[in-house]
């Protein structure tokens, strides 16, 4: 639909034109907007015309890593809402609490509660929603109990080591995925430590 600019919009345009080293900052709320693709494309066009840079602030410190490693829905992929609405029958949740980590927690919970839907949860905590929604819970080491890598806002790769040993039978998330892949006879999961996972992920991002 056609939009008629008001005085505030005109002031923004004037500021953009007057600026020489401008940056358009996008927030996490954009990613949860149903029209995020259209908005992002529009912002990209504005940045191109005005010779501005775009800074995308994310809620998660590792969101850029997921994008760099192509660990996000592709052209034929599905986001969480699409999975819920398309009657998916199996879910693998990794460090996800249904009560807090979905924009529509009721939709997620209702989907997981369907009788023929199977849910595996890799979790570091004994949350009530995890017990309620998961058919199988695999104990996963927390952030402090595993090594790993982030890519920060500036694109800098930051690796870290475990601060403490994980308790009981809990294992790092990558190792749980590796063992599951081995049991399913899947190829490409011959990792010995997290640095190999990091190296392959960074290689795929080039």
Region spans (language model):
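Non-catalytic alpha/beta scaffold blocks inside enzyme catalytic domains
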Residues: 1-206
């Amino acid at each position: 639909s056609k939009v008629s600019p008001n005085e505030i919009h005109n002031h923004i345009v004037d500021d953009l034109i007057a600026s020489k080293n401008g940056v358009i900052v996008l927030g996490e709320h954009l990613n949860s907007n149903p029209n995020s693709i259209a908005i992002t494309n529009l912002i990209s066009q504005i940045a191109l015309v005005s010779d501005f840079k775009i800074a995308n602030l994310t809620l998660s410190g590792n969101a850029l890593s997921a994008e760099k490693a192509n660990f996000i829905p592709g052209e034929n992929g599905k986001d969480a809402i699409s999975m819920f609405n398309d009657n998916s029958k199996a879910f693998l949740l990794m460090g996800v609490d249904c009560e807090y980590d979905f924009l529509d927690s009721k939709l997620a919970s209702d989907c997981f509660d369907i009788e023929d839907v199977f849910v595996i949860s890799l979790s570091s905590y004994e949350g009530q929603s995890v017990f309620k929604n998961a058919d199988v819970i695999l104990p996963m080491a927390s952030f402090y109990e595993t090594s790993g890598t982030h890519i920060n806002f500036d694109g800098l790769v930051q690796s870290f080591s475990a601060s403490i040993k994980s308790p009981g039978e809990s294992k790092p998330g990558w190792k749980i995925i590796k063992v599951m892949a081995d049991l399913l006879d899947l190829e490409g999961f011959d990792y010995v430590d997290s640095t190999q996972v990091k190296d392959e992920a960074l290689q795929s991002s080039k």
